[in-house]
Structure formats: C-alpha cells, structure tokens
C-alpha cells in the first residue's frame, strides 16, 4: 500500500505483529493468504475483533476454492469478519486508530480499527546473500531452484521464503 509506513503499533507488518506490545481491541488484516489467515485466527482467539480483507475472490487465494471455503466458513463461525473481492483505500492513521475505506464493486464502507496488519507483498531479501562472483539465477527476486531445491549453481540449495510463495517464515 503506497505511502503507508509500518510503525509497529497502528500499522504493522507480520514481523512487527509477532512483537506487538499491546493486543489491539480491533484490527484489519490486509491479505488473506497463509500469513493473514494465521494472524486472523490467533488474534481472534485472543479476543481481538478481526476484519480480514482479500482483494481476490476467496481467502487463501493460493489454495483450492473448496479448502478456502471451509476455512472461511469456520472463520465466520468464530466471529472473524471476512471480506473478499474487497480493496482497502484511503487509509488514515492517527494516534489512536486507523480509518480506511473498504471498497467492493461500487460499494464503499468506512471502518475504523485500532490497528492494521499488512499481510501482503512479501519480498525476498537476497542482497548480500552470496559473493557477487556467484552467479545465482533469480526469478522476480527469488532464488530459482529445481525440484530438489538446488539453485542454478551446483551445490547451492535454497528453501523457504527466499524461493517464493508460499511465504511461511512467520510461523
């Protein structure tokens, strides 16, 4: 989200959320992939009012529709407000809350929460990973590997978030 800086309290990344000092009473989680869904589940379990927002047409967008539907139904039964096919716009952060518009089609709803968690746009950090003399092939910033997790350089293997989705280093 452009011009939105994570401060670790009102606006959080998933890493910052793991270190939060105070549990928010309410939170909007932007991105309903594995990271967003996990945070939605456990924050809700601890009593935070959770709104989970996904731009695509179902939560857990890299999973099959059937699995996502079962998880979404469970989330709704547990009290998580799931919004799919929804964009987050006009985010305004102040000392006590975050206000934003949730846009779905031609309908806009303004909501306010204590915090917003950004669970989108994980980027691999390969800078300084190896000597510049090692010609490691990257694909959109991620280390390219074969079926055995070997990189383009014989004997160098990679696994985890550095090879791309699904990004699960937060667990």
Predicted segments with their positions:
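Short, T/G/N/S-enriched strand-turn elements that build extracellular solenoid repeat scaffolds
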Residues: 1-3
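FAD-site-proximal beta/loop scaffold in flavoenzymes
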Residues: 5-23, 110-171
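Rossmann-like dinucleotide-binding cores of NAD(P)H-dependent redox enzymes
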Residues: 18-19, 24-28, 34-107, 166-171
């Amino acid at each position: 989200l452009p011009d939105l800086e994570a401060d670790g309290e009102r606006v959080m990344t998933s890493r910052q959320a793991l270190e939060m000092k105070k549990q928010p009473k309410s939170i909007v989680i932007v991105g309903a992939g594995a990271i967003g869904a996990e945070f939605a589940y456990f924050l809700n379990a601890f009593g935070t009012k959770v709104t989970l927002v996904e731009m695509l047409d179902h939560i857990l967008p890299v999973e099959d529709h059937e699995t996502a539907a079962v998880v979404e139904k469970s989330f709704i039964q547990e009290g998580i407000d799931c919004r799919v096919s929804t964009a987050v716009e006009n985010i305004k952060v102040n000392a006590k809350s975050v206000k934003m518009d949730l846009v779905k089609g031609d309908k806009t709803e303004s909501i306010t929460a204590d915090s917003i968690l950004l669970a989108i746009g994980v980027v691999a950090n390969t800078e300084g990973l190896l000597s510049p003399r090692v010609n490691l092939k990257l694909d959109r910033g991620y280390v390219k590997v074969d079926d055995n997790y070997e990189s383009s350089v014989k004997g160098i293997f990679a696994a985890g978030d550095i090879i791309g989705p699904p990004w699960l280093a937060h667990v």
